[in-house]
């Protein structure tokens, strides 16, 4: 890491465990470029799984999909992948690449497990989905079929972007409250008239509502930003966070005080002030 004064800092090490001093690696990773410039990173690779199994399920209603997720979380299985797509996302993917997805489905869930118990785990997830009223639920341990099912989720971002400009949101809630968040997003979309394609990582409660912008007028942008703030407010009411992956950036700087108290903000400002007193790094962003 290159610091604001030009000094070079190396963090971390080759050991599996290391608690000598503060965890500076995580501090700089999470700083959005406000504390230093990361010029290199060393990663540890994990071996490819020797066996995978994949499942997919569709639901006619949002409520049924949420019941399935609650059942999956309660079942104790720990899939390596647990993703969801709403109807807007399903249709975007199907418009982009014909995959014979059910356009009438309100929710699509895709899960994948690996290891010796992979098929047993996805079979358990299939049962949870069937018990919740899935219109379709199937599993496979064939790698080619699994790759085809996963492709639908991987195409979601490209398919949504192909439709037109969007604001991509990034919010996360406790998994037990994910259903409430999805319901709130659907309500906000209906009330505002802004179409929202929601896709996300159900396994950790992190979703990405994509707000479609019919045009780039100031009025449309203002409406969309107000909708994004409503989603963040709903997220905080569910004990969540306004960002799970993408960071605060510029858009959410003004909303950060809704989540962090004055002490937390002051500590972060003090850290930044100590490392970059002149505000040279990523100006206009931060705390």
Regions found by a protein language model. Name each.
Residues 1-287:
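Noncatalytic alpha-helical scaffold of FAD-dependent oxidoreductases
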């Amino acid at each position: 890491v290159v610091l604001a004064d030009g000094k070079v800092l190396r963090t971390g090490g080759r050991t599996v465990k290391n608690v000598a001093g503060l965890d500076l690696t995580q501090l700089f990773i999470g700083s959005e470029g406000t504390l230093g410039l990361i010029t290199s990173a060393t990663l540890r690779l994990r071996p490819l799984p020797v066996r995978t199994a994949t499942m997919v399920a569709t639901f006619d209603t949002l409520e049924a999909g949420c019941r399935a997720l609650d059942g999956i979380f309660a079942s104790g299985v720990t899939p390596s992948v647990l993703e969801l797509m709403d109807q807007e996302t399903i249709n975007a993917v199907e418009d982009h690449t014909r995959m014979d997805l059910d356009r009438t489905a309100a929710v699509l869930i895709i899960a994948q497990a690996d290891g010796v118990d992979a098929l047993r785990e996805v079979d358990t997830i299939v049962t949870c989905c069937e018990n919740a009223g899935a219109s379709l639920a199937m599993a496979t341990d064939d790698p080619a079929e699994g790759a085809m099912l996963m492709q639908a989720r991987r195409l979601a971002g490209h398919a949504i972007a192909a439709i037109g400009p969007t604001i991509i949101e990034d919010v996360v809630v406790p998994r037990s409250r994910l259903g409430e968040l999805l319901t709130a997003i659907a309500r906000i979309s209906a009330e505002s008239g802004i179409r929202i394609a929601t896709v996300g990582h159900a396994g950790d409660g992190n979703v990405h509502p994509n707000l479609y912008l019919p045009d780039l007028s100031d009025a449309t942008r203002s409406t969309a930003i107000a909708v994004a703030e409503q989603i963040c407010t709903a997220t905080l009411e569910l004990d969540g966070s306004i960002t799970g992956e993408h960071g605060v950036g510029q858009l959410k700087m003004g909303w950060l005080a809704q989540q962090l108290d004055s002490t937390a903000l002051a500590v972060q400002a003090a850290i930044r002030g100590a490392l970059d007193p002149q505000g040279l790094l990523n100006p206009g962003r931060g705390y």
